[in-house]
Design a protein with these regions (language model features):
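Non-catalytic beta/alpha edge segments that cap or flank active sites
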Residues: 1-189
């Protein structure tokens, strides 16, 4: 049980609901990584598949804001992708532009995702957690998350937040059950 679960006692897992696999695209943002040495991307792929979800696509892009935003938009337009998780480019250096690319695409941002990620990171990395700009949001009915480029950060975000919220059986609420409602604003016009 995680530290967050110990403190937030109202979480439940329903045996009455069936597991629903989610289609997830993984994007590694790096000027140097290739698939063969992409440990963070592999960490995510292994955890996604291990949980019973589907890796819909996997790519590596350089730290170029427009390229990242274009790829995010392409996945948001692809009906075979429900969720996008990127790793890398969330720090403070001049080349770290993943967060800006995500925010170029978001229709709504999930502020609590950043907060929860920082809470999870702090006991492990201490004050270094202040340098993370992990974020999450929604665009075109697709969830998007930007994680730091370390395998540990990917593991923590998946194990503590994403695996729980992407499991339809989790209560009192989860991301999967509100998929059909993400684009309600478009139907009202």
């Amino acid at each position: 049980m995680s530290a967050l679960q110990e403190n937030g006692k109202s979480e439940t897992m329903s045996n009455e609901k069936e597991f629903i696999p989610v289609r997830i695209a993984v994007l590694t943002v790096s000027d140097t990584r290739k698939i063969e040495d992409d440990k963070s991307g592999k960490t995510l792929v292994d955890r996604i598949e291990g949980a019973g979800h589907i890796v819909a696509d996997r790519k590596i892009l350089r730290d170029e804001r427009e390229q990242i935003a274009d790829q995010l938009r392409a996945w948001c337009a692809d009906k075979d992708v429900d969720v996008v998780i990127s790793t890398g480019g969330t720090g403070l250096t001049g080349r770290d532009v993943t967060v800006e690319a995500h925010r170029d695409v978001y229709e709504k941002e999930m502020d609590a995702f950043s907060t929860l990620f920082t809470m999870i990171s702090f006991p492990k990395v201490g004050m270094s957690a202040v340098q993370s700009r992990a974020c999450g949001g929604v665009a075109n009915g697709t969830y998007l998350f930007a994680l730091p480029g370390s395998p540990g950060a990917c593991k923590d975000a998946w194990d503590e937040i994403l695996s729980v919220q992407l499991d339809y059986r989790h209560g009192p609420c989860n991301f999967v059950e509100i998929f059909p409602r993400l684009e309600e604003h478009k139907r009202r016009k």
